[in-house]
Amino acid sequence: MGNIESVDGQSEMKHHIMPLKVPMPDPTELEERFAIVLNSMNLPPDKARLLRQYDNEKKWDLICDQERFQVKNPPHTYIQKLRGYLDPKVTRKKFRRRVQESTKVLRELEISLRTNHIGWVREFLNDENRGLDILVEYLSFAQCAVMLDFEGLENGEDFSLDKAKSWSRSIEDLHQNGCNTLVRSARQSVLRYGSTSNSKTIKNSRLVSQKDDVHVCIMCLRAIMNYQYGFNLVMSHAHAVNEIALSLNNKNPRTKALVLELLAAVCLVRGGHEIILSAFDNFKEVCKEKHRFEKLMEYFRSEDGNIDFMVACMQFINIVVHSVEDMNFRVHLQYEFTKLGLDDFLEKSKHTESDKLSVQIQAYLDNVFDVGGLLEDAETKNVALEKVEELEEHLSHVTEKLLDVENETMTKVADLEKQLLHKDKELAVIKETYESASTQVHTLRRMIQEKDAAFQRHNNIEKQLLELEQQGTIRLRKQPDGDIAIETLGAGAVAGTPLTDLRSLTVGMSTIGGLGGTSAVPVEAVAPPPPPPPPPPPPPPAPPLPSEVESIPIPPPPPPPLPGPSPSVILSVGLSAIRIKKPIKTKFRLPVFNWTALKPNQINGTVFNEIDDDRVLEELDLEKFEELFKTKAQGPVVDLSCSKSKVSQKVINKVQLLDANRSKNLAITLRKANKTTEEICKAIQTFDLKALPVDFVECLMRFLPTEAESKLLRQYERERRPLDQLAEEDRFMLLFSKIERLTQRMSIITFVGNFNDNVNMLTPQLNAIIAASASVKSSPKLKKILEIILALGNYMNSSKRGSVYGFKLQSLDLLLDTKSTDRKMTLLHYIALVVKEKYPELANFYNELHFVDKAAAVSLENVLLDVKELGKGMDLVRRECSLHDHAVLKGFAQTSDTQLDKLAKDAKTAEEAFNNVVLYFGESPKTTPPSVFFPVFVRFIRAYKEAVEENEQRKKQEEAMREKLLAQEAKQHDPKVQAQKKRHQQQELIAELRRRQAKDHRPVYEGKDGTIEDIITVLKSVPFTARTAKRGSRFFCDANLFDESIC
């Protein structure tokens, strides 16, 4: 039965059933009622604006049409009929006549609850109508006779009356908080079990029980529970779930299966498991069971001919036992059914021919806990864990002692090394003093030898002078100032002693005098040369002129030899002197000017030989020049004089052990810290992140000493060579390599420094995966879109390839490749038109797919690896804290444990959510990562929006063409064409509204409705297993499905 009438039926009723047209009210009331009608239509603004332009006559017609399209029966109609069935004052004959329609009324009610809008359902359940109470009471009334028949009325009237009394108390409990007079009257009639009315009530109940009223009542409750609002009412009702559970006593296996399916679905809702167990506790009390679930097992064994009931029963047992998270309680429930003989019965039934039942039985057996095996494994594991813990503790103590001994040894070795260096320096000073003293002694010895030789020459000269004086050649005369003057005498003297020999003698005398401390002996005057000798002897040389020989002083000692050339001057034969330009030390590094230089031998004769660039440098402001042209990433300004001396020392004295490029890069890195080597090493040892920036530590990680470098540095130390002779980078590397557990410490510092950044980076990515997975999986509109695509695809392919039941999501990309005959439209464009015309509620389906674009950019595998690495880093920090007392690390561990635990939980949740949604769409999580899965939806949404936009443009073009044609026709015909066109638009709009009103389809309710049906459908297709229980429970209790009152 439908709730609204078809268009054809409307026209028929308009002529035959509907009364005459009601007179039009006054304009004010008309506008108010018209506004209410417009609001109920939920029209777009442009169409609502068009309707407001109607005249009053058309507005009144629209109001009348709308008011005729109302739900056929209001809720109170069904409630009055159900109350009539419960009225104890009704005669037997009248009740028999009424009850003939009870099943039909209940079926109509079920259809109305399932298909009408939520407002109708809320009205049925409100405090005024109390429809849920009436349904539960009628269900209890219908089952009263079933209970009596079950116990056996043949046992005697007293026994049956006692059971009636017990059952009536159950009915009375349904409304212990107060109910209407009619219900109290019916309840009192049942309590009077000895009276005629009590017997009549039981007979009426038996009459009802022979029909399908119990089954349809359960269907009505199921329809109510499919709405969030109704589900809340049923769960909070004191006896609704109890009465549903008691319906298992119905003789119809179909009804039992329906009840068990509904109860199984409730079990998977958070808090529902406790309610179901409470209902079966009540079942045990009412039905006088010795053990809970006793009747259920009895029905399970006896209804072996009805497979659907057995499947539903096995499914319910599996869920009620294995859907709890508390393992102890789960084992308790499992044992509860074992005592009732479930294990033996399943052993007999597991070879059943029914595939559905076999699957459910196997699912239960897969979930069963083998407590004995678990206990044995647990004991073995505990022993192993205790041994491991003991060994780890022992190893920890030994390692700690070893580290202490190593630290003490290293301290002693360091002290000894310092003493050794000090002694080496003292030895160097002694050697230098010894070498200086040896040089002085050697110089003194040479001077003594030279003096001895000079005195010997002096004696020889004196002898020669005495000989000459005795020969009469010269005469020695002492002058007043103490000098000795030599005077040449007669010609005879010249014959034996030439003038050159005399000069040499005087020079020798001068030298001796100089060495001995006496004055030089000048030659005051030389007599004219004697007359030439007789021919035999050789003629003497020509005597000097009188002016030349007046006085011949003794020349001074010869000058010392010339020193080597100056370092600033090059003497070149045939070339002028060239100054060697000294290197200029700048405060900052400057860029290179890539010119082509002349060689020194090319300078001579050029303009460059005439210019002085040093003078220009003295005139320029070089500091400003350096500020303008210095390269980036410069260190602090260094004193120029100090830098000159350091550079010269480095060039001359420093020893380099590292590779040149590596040493250069290390120097650049160290300058960034602006700290000494000792400060850096101390900060690393104390995990001081305030002293060392994280980026500097990360750069320093690239310079961890290699094995070859450590070998070189150790060799240098073994040779006991002084550290101050090492280059600054080599010295840093030497101290750096001495830090205990250097790699581990650097890793911890890097981990601690980057922890917050990593958490802040990973958390949004995990949130994107979780949100996108949940939205894609729970989107009913997307599901409907895929349904449309599957339908059209099967329609196109069925004749050639046959129909299929699903398709890979990658197929969505092919919608644009499938084109129409005229090649103007693709299959996606057509789907967009279909959605707009037939399923307008699906037009914004992409609004339900949240964060798919962000999730598409996430590499879940890398994120999970990063989270795992964070866990390893935290373990490293904890291990370090357990071995050594580091306040910094302890404080970090205390503040960061919560963040890391939350991040790990988020990562697990993201992985599970993604795996679920991928499996839900028929893909494999192993081959379909988020970077492949979510981009499919991103591309599809983008293509769909473009298709919608292109359709709108095409439609506008067609409308423009049509208006152009109409304008051309208007010129040829009556000028009233525009008015006719406007009326035509209004008629189309009215027709569309009527089509929407007459359209019989279930509306898509917002958010959280429809979940119970989804659960039941999923359970029918996929058996419940314990490993999916937790995921399933979260899925069914997602915030997008239920509110906190449900979950």
Swiss-Prot record:
InterPro entries referenced in this protein's UniProt entry, alphabetically: ARM-like, ARM-type_fold, DAD_dom, FH2_Formin, FH2_Formin_sf, FH3_dom, FMNL_animal, GBD/FH3_dom
Location in or out of the cell: Cytoplasm; Cell membrane
MF-aspect GO terms: actin filament binding; small GTPase binding
SUPFAM superfamilies: ARM repeat, Formin homology 2 domain (FH2 domain)
Gene Ontology biological process terms from the UniProt entry: actin filament polymerization; angiogenesis; cell migration; cortical actin cytoskeleton organization; filopodium assembly; regulation of cell shape; sprouting angiogenesis
Compositional bias per record (Pro residues), positions renumbered to this chain: 527-546
Residue ranges of every copy of the DAD domain listed in the record: 1000-1037
Keywords: Actin-binding, Angiogenesis, Cell membrane, Cytoplasm, Developmental protein, Lipoprotein, Membrane, Myristate
Cytoplasm among keywords: yes
GO annotations of cellular component type: cytosol; plasma membrane
Record's bilayer topology term: Lipid-anchor
Location of the FH2 domain: 580-970
Domain named GBD/FH3: residues: 22-462
Region entry Disordered, spans: 520-561
Lipidation, N-myristoyl glycine type: G2
Phenotype of the disrupted gene, per the record: Morpholino knockdown of the protein causes profound defects in angiogenesis. Although sprouting of the intersomitic vessels occurs, the endothelial cells fail to extend fully across the intersomic region and there is no apparent formation of the dorsal longitudinal anastomosing vessel. No other obvious defect is observed in the developing morphant.
Signal peptide: none
Chain's role: Required for developmental angiogenesis, but not for vasculogenesis.
Protein family membership: Belongs to the formin homology family.
Name of the protein in its database record: Formin-like protein 3
